[in-house]
Amino acid sequence: MAKIVDIKGREVLDSRGNPTVEADVLLDNGIIGSACAPSGASTGSREALELRDGDKSRYMGKGVLKAVANINGPIRDLLLGKDPVDQKALDHAMIELDGTENKASLGANAILAVSLAAAKAAAQDQDLPLYAHIANLNGTPGVYSMPVPMMNIINGGEHADNNIDIQEFMIQPVGAKSFAEGLRWGTEIFHHLKAVLKARGLNTAVGDEGGFAPNLASNKEALDAIAEAVANAGYTLGTDVTLALDCAASEFYKNGKYKLSEEGEYSSAEFAEYLAELTRKHPIISIEDGLDESDWDGWKILTDKIGEKTQLVGDDLFVTNTKILKEGIDKKIANSILIKFNQIGTLTETLEAIQMAKAAGYTAIISHRSGETEDSTIADLAVGTSAGQIKTGSLCRSDRVSKYNQLLRIEEQLGSKAVYRGRAEFRG
């Protein structure tokens, strides 16, 4: 049995040019597992704490040397000599050492980087692909499925410097026969969308997640542009390809009202109806954070209104936290959870959230953050848990494409065992 003999933390840069944490876990047989913590832009108020230095003389206060010091000091001391394969013991030891509800002492970014690096080292030690090791940790050994990609091809909200309120307009290649085919479809649509926007005299610069970030007159205009791109690419909207939204509604919820820059002001019930009307007019099969994270009454209205046929995803609402998710399940709020490692801070707690969601009949979507690195762990997480869906941005920027490329490798490795369920992963 291999043992951990060293742990090293360092400050590296994410895709937005901000510092983040990378950790190496070294084993006594020479194996090294490395992982980076991602960082979000639109964040839920109840997420685990991302520890930043606050020193304005370095990186405008966004440095992570405190988190790195916690890795190189107390976390290293705690885990030396431990078995890397026992993920639960490692994660619980770090949680106990931190001693806070939201990992504010050591920093969720420090704990997560070590948690994921240990999992990578353990996978190598057992001569397993990371997704296979994750499946073992998940209690589903040998069970894998390829996720349907939810491709964010128009960026708005906090992910872009434009006037679109809704943060993400996504496409899903639900009619494809494999992940590789679905990725090709999405890429072709992405390039056709660029041509559509150019023909309209619109900007084709991209946002944080690689989607285009044009100034459009309304959210409807974004949907219309995507519909034109899908048709121009030779696919049928509603059968080959469907749509999804991430409203990130907490970002435009002010004083009890939802305020859209071009389309007016709405109460909770009115905005729920606004979203319902969008699903009637467009083949939108998934809506994320359609209402504010604190507007549970509004969420209940939306769930009762369209939850039977539409996937309603809690991101800021649930923040990958089993306590909050259980409350949502009990109250029949939403029907899906977005899974982000760094919202909770360990691999073990991430797996627990996925397991709780699935047991309750909720879907679980594995997700990146807007501040990413070349680390592709979420691709292995999606396959190893058979989550069925993944959000990892658009079809450009290497911080996004690295995850897609890892999924291509995994599908090739699995061969005939690779299952891609397409539309069956969604409601309705």
From Swiss-Prot:
It is found in: Cytoplasm; Secreted; Cell surface. Pfam families: Enolase_C, Enolase_N. GO terms for cellular component: cell surface; extracellular region; phosphopyruvate hydratase complex. Pathway: Carbohydrate degradation; glycolysis; pyruvate from D-glyceraldehyde 3-phosphate: step 4/5. Binds a second Mg(2+) ion via substrate during catalysis. (2R)-2-phosphoglycerate binds at residues 167, 340, 369-370, 391. Its cofactor is Mg(2+). The active site is at residues 209, 340. It is an enzyme of class 4 (lyase). GO terms for molecular function: magnesium ion binding; phosphopyruvate hydratase activity. Its EC number is 4.2.1.11. SMART domains: Enolase_C, Enolase_N. Keywords: Cytoplasm, Glycolysis, Lyase, Magnesium, Metal-binding, Secreted. Coiled coil: none annotated. PANTHER family: ENOLASE. Catalyzes the reversible conversion of 2-phosphoglycerate (2-PG) into phosphoenolpyruvate (PEP). It is essential for the degradation of carbohydrates via glycolysis. Component of the RNA degradosome, a multiprotein complex involved in RNA processing and mRNA degradation. HAMAP family: Enolase. This is Enolase 1.
